[in-house]
């Protein structure tokens, strides 16, 4: 390739070996909810969307995908708990593999970030606690999301939820995915258990840091045993307080999880930068991910507000192995190429992030060739 030299001088565009997977570059497609899976079934247009963002040896993570019928909290997000879901994912995975991509499915349970309209038989959502969530303004800045007060899970119910994650991982492998990412971030069920401002349990799943991390680690253990630890990652956001899920000692929480994950030998740990305290906004912050980075023995992925410049710097200074890009990858299907040649980026269109149109704001962002 004629610009091979230029490529080598861009840290984000250097190859990386992630366990069994040989990555050609370090620009990862972050998991992005897009709400275009009608009736929770992945659609053919998703094959176009993901394959547009695939490069040979590129690593992609799906949008958050529900592990059960109680896992949903948003309109038209995909699932992976039925045979129909598995069959619908297969051509999407095939499209990514046809272009040489590595594709992980992010498995997810929203916990209390839901309302009875999304729940089977109109029941209350489940959580570690019965603490209700305040209404939130949606991303369009107008509509209000209302949450039904959750039902506290009985201790006898928790193994069933762990098993839902295990079965979802098995289904992901049946659909052809290369692995799964456990969604332990952003105020959803796993994060609710970890965070002391939400988890007020008095049994073995609440109280101490170790007890609050018991549920997440049981899921890691079950999923790793089901599909092999070398096909498992986890996403964490210890420093964030999305969906009123903050922690009073996030540094200790993050470090404990990073150290504990080593016992299971999983492939990677994907962490949202401390500067991303709330969704989409960068804040000045004294915390750093370096203690977690140093403690975790597998591949480390950082996400949260990265540009080309600070992504390159994070890799070159050894602060992370890979960098996950969300909004910029959404708007620039050929983001690795643009980073390689330092091309200008398409601006993202926030109003179409979560609309249901199968093309507009989804597969119609221009490529470099078509903008020349």
UniProtKB/Swiss-Prot annotation:
Gene3D superfamilies: Aldolase class I. It is found in: Cytoplasm. Its EC number is 1.3.1.42. It comes from Arabidopsis thaliana. Pathway: Lipid metabolism; oxylipin biosynthesis. GO terms for molecular function: 12-oxophytodienoate reductase activity; FMN binding. It comes from the Eukaryota. This is 12-oxophytodienoate reductase 1. InterPro entries: Aldolase_TIM (IPR013785), OxRdtase_FMN_N (IPR001155), Oye-like (IPR045247).
């Amino acid at each position: 390739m004629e610009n091979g030299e230029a490529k080598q001088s861009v840290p984000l565009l250097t190859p990386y070996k992630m366990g069994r997977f040989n990555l050609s570059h370090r620009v990862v497609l972050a998991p992005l909810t897009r709400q275009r899976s009608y009736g929770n079934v992945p659609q053919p247009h998703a094959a176009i969307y993901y394959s547009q963002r695939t490069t040979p040896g590129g690593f992609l993570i799906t949008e958050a995908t529900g592990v059960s019928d109680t896992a949903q909290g948003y309109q038209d997000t995909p699932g992976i708990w039925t045979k129909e879901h598995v069959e619908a994912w297969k051509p999407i995975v095939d499209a990514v593999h046809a272009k040489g991509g590595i594709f992980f499915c992010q498995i997810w349970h929203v916990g209390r970030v839901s309302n009875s309209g999304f729940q089977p038989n109109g029941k209350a959502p489940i959580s570690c606690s019965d603490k209700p969530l305040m209404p939130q303004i949606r991303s369009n800045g107008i509509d209000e999301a209302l949450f039904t007060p959750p039902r506290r899970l009985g201790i006898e119910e928790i193994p069933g939820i762990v098993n839902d994650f295990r079965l979802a991982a098995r289904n992901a492998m049946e659909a052809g995915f290369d692995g799964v990412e456990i969604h332990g971030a952003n105020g959803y069920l796993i994060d609710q258990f970890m965070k002391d401002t939400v988890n007020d349990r008095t049994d073995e799943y609440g109280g101490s840091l170790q007890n609050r991390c018991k549920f997440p680690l049981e899921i890691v253990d079950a999923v790793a045993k089901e599909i092999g630890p070398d096909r498992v990652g986890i996403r964490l956001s210890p420093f964030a307080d999305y969906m009123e899920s903050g922690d009073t000692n996030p540094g200790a929480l993050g470090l404990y999880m990073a150290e504990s994950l080593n016992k299971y030998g999983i492939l990677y740990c994907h962490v949202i930068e401390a500067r991303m305290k709330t969704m989409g906004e960068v804040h000045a912050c004294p915390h750093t991910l370096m203690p977690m980075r140093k403690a975790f023995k597998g591949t480390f992925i950082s996400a949260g507000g990265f540009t080309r410049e600070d992504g390159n710097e994070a890799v070159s200074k050894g602060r992370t192995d890979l960098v996950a890009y969300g909004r910029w990858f959404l708007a620039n299907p050929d983001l690795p190429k643009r980073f390689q040649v330092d091309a200008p980026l398409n601006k993202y269109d926030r109003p179409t992030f979560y609309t249901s149109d199968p093309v507009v704001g989804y597969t119609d962002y221009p490529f470099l060739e078509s903008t020349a």
